[in-house]
Amino acid sequence: MRNLFCHSNPVPRIGTTIAAALLSLAALTACGEAGALEPLDRWRDGEREIRTTAPAVTAGRTLLAAGDYGNFRLTGEALTQPGAQAALLFHTDGESGYEVVFRNGAIDGTRKSGSLASVRNLYRSLADDGEWFGFEVTVRGRNIVVRIDTTEVVCYTEPEHPYRTQAHARQLLGHGAIALRGVQGEVAFRNLAIERLGAQARNEADTLPPVDERTDGVIRFQQRDFPVIDYHVHLKGGLTKERAHAMSMNYGINYGVAPNAGEGGVGRMLADDGEVYAYFDEVERMPFLCGVQGEGRKWTATFSQEALGVFDYLFTDAMTIID
């Protein structure tokens, strides 16, 4: 696999200097009842306490929410500016826990919105800069689900023996606070709310067995923020776009799913511009890269540049030329 991109923007962790503030905020908030929707509106900004469900963070600013959470469902909306990035941390004490990335824009090797940082990194954004988009983060037992708008982009089950590098040694589930951290530019949030889930809550849709990370190579790349992308996936042999979606989330591999434009290929075939646009409408909101493979010799004349230009990338090979 070629390293086409370099993630050159590592994000520091919150740091132990604010761990005491997290504990202080947790003490201010009652445990709450499972199933009760709570506005996430009490934050500590350094030494200052603020009340809002619409916070914004800029580079170097961290907001710590009151409360301690185990199983939960957190919902809200986010707005990114071009080049801006922020993180939502959970199960954190200032050093531990996971983070969800908020960053949009072109496919350029940076981690995109919905990434479970350094565990399930995503490289194609389903949201746009300058537009509000919904998100949801749910923790049930050992399972973490992240949604961008209505699309599930991460479904990760922490195995019994998770692999973590020294830098991510405390990137583990447990319980703890929620935090927002600015990385660069400004990211705004609104309508933040959190629902406590019972201790026995489980994701019934999580039917695939957890990956054994003691022997898994993908998690080793993910922990080092090395882009793990398979650009050449075809929908054939029983592989549907829905199954590709599930497999991508389970194995931690970003799939580039490509139909065949032209003649002579195997799998999903596109015959003209109309079929190109119809296919792209099907997959545009799915969390994988959208490529297209030119087949045969006629595809450059059969399809317009405008139609092929809707895809993230185009490639061809000489293995199945029939004309």
Give the predicted meaning of each segment.
Residues C31-D212:
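Carbohydrate-interacting regions of secretory-pathway proteins
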